[in-house]
A protein has these predicted regions:
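Short, Lys/Arg-enriched N-terminal segments with co-localized hydrophobic residues
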Residues: 1-6
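An alpha-helical support segment within catalytic cores of ATP-dependent transferases
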Residues: 7-21, 124-176
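Short, conserved clusters of charged catalytic residues that mark active-site
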Residues: 10, 23, 64-67
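Conserved N-terminal boundary motif of the eukaryotic protein kinase catalytic domain
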Residues: 21-30
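ATP-binding pocket architecture of kinase catalytic cores
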Residues: 29-151
């Protein structure tokens, strides 16, 4: 059996576990535009699913994205896709999401802007960070808790990016 076929079988199994019934993929359409991941829209004829695929080593990136979506969803401020699952096959990892309808910019745009503003007004803690690390594209991003926004941003956003640049041979000098 080909690696791709094994991957699609693994995806069907995760979706079957999520939906409580066998998920027979009847249609697969590649979605253009992903720079880091391969993206697909699949359906069993009833439930469309958005699929992000990458090498097996990217599973932790997909797990972090799923955790972030679930965390943001708890704010009840903005419409986000439901996470159906994260999984792996022999050579691939994948993130399975509710397929949201894509629409042209309409009069719903101001509503989305209002929801986004509400999201940024949510405050659940006086500290900055997360209980888990995340990813910025293909790059790991630490999120250790810090009581100071300025220190968090300087060390774990700007400082971290400068360190990544230095590791790749780009040195901006001493910033301490």
């Amino acid at each position: 059996m080909s690696r791709r076929r094994i991957m699609w079988k693994s995806i069907s199994q995760v979706l079957a576990d999520q939906f409580g019934a066998y998920y027979n993929i009847k249609e697969k359409n590649k979605v253009p535009g992903g720079e880091v991941n391969e993206t697909w829209l699949i359906t069993d004829g009833i439930q469309p699913v958005f699929v992000k695929v990458n090498e097996r080593s990217y599973r932790s990136m997909f797990r972090a994205e799923a955790d972030q979506l679930n965390l943001l969803g708890k704010t009840n401020t903005i419409r986000l896709p439901q996470v159906y699952g994260v999984g792996c096959s022999q050579n691939h990892s994948f993130l399975l999401l509710e397929a949201l309808p894509i629409t042209q910019q309409t009069n719903a745009t101001p509503h989305f802007a209002e929801e986004l503003a509400k999201l940024h007004q949510v405050s659940g803690t006086k500290n900055y960070g997360l209980d888990f690390d995340t990813w910025l594209g293909p790059e790991y991003q630490p999120n250790k808790w810090n009581g100071s926004w300025a220190k968090f941003f300087a060390e774990q956003r700007i400082g971290w990016q400068l360190q990544l640049c230095k590791d790749k041979g780009l040195d901006f000098g001493d910033i301490d």
